[in-house]
A protein has these predicted regions:
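Active-site-proximal helix-loop elements at catalytic-domain edges
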Residues: 1-14, 166-180
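N-terminal Rossmann-like NAD(P)+-binding subdomain of aldehyde/semialdehyde dehydrogenases
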Residues: 1-120
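Alpha-helical scaffold segments in soluble metabolic enzymes
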Residues: 33, 37, 48, 82-85, ...
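Flexible, glycine/proline-enriched loop segments at strand-loop-helix junctions
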Residues: 35, 127-131, 153-159, 176-183, ...
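Short acidic/polar active-site loop segments enriched in Thr and Asp
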Residues: 42, 150, 178
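Conserved small-residue-rich beta-alpha loop and adjacent elements
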Residues: 104-170
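Alpha-helix termination/capping residues and helix-transition junctions
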Residues: 116, 146, 174, 196-199
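Conserved NAD(P)+-binding/catalytic subdomain of aldehyde/semialdehyde dehydrogenases
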Residues: 176-230
Length: 230
């Protein structure tokens, strides 16, 4: 049921605009249970959790390369043009950050310089559902590609039909990322941190999410997987 408010008192604004959230202890217990299930039952846990939480049954979490390539045919041409403009702008910005680092001799025979090296394996969490954030994939995927990251793995929640939004797959195609997995929520973060039969274990996880995803990233950090932020 939708409620409509008309000229609410200023004292009530904080309560009205407060996002729903679980008590911290309860949230930790829920996420810890998810981690225990993924650790114990591997991909089977992911299937059970996806059915329970996302309302769809997934047998093969990895999106096929042909499905990724076909996605552009389902997207409005004007949206594709806009995405390519955004891609070019983001690419030019991050590419400008690659500069040769000067070596400084701080004392005879002692030279110092700054060196940047790519992370080998990263996981990108891309929110999906009713509002797929393909912009997040552009802003995370482009710098990862420029940096020379060898293995980029995308996890994103499927819809009720067990599918990923075409626009996310289209962005993955222009980024030339083939490892896209139909899995979201706290369980996807656990899968990236622990590794499963299907989803590779990564060195660092990037990307925003809800309170369950954020708490799961905290667990990932305690498991030895680097994260971008909480």
């Amino acid at each position: 049921m939708i409620s409509y408010l008309k000229n609410p008192e200023i004292q009530s604004w904080e309560k009205i605009f407060c996002r729903p959230k679980l008590e911290e202890k309860k949230l930790s217990q829920i996420v810890e249970k998810i981690w225990d299930e993924v650790r114990l039952k591997n991909d089977n846990a992911l299937r059970e959790l996806t059915k329970k939480l996302d309302g769809c049954e997934i047998q093969d979490f990895k999106v096929s390369e042909s499905r990724i390539e076909q996605s552009k045919n389902n997207i409005d041409i004007e949206l594709r043009k806009s995405i390519l403009v955004a891609y070019d702008n983001i690419f030019r910005f991050h590419n400008s950050q690659i500069k040769p680092h000067a070596k400084i001799e701080i004392s005879p025979g002692v030279k110092c310089w700054r060196e940047s090296r790519p992370i080998n394996n990263v996981g990108l969490y891309i929110p999906g559902g009713s509002a797929p954030l393909f912009s997040t994939l552009l802003m995370l995927g482009i710098p990862a590609k420029i940096a020379g990251v060898k293995n980029i793995n995308i996890v994103t929640p499927p819809n009720r039909d067990g599918e990923i939004d075409d626009v996310i797959l289209y962005v993955a195609s222009i980024l030339k990322i083939s490892n896209v997995f139909k899995i979201g929520g706290a369980q996807s973060i656990a899968a990236l941190s622990l590794g499963t039969n299907t989803i590779p274990k990564v060195d660092k996880i990037f990307g925003p999410g809800n309170q369950y995803v954020t708490k799961s990233k905290f667990f990932a950090s305690n498991n030895g997987t680097d994260i971008d932020m909480l």
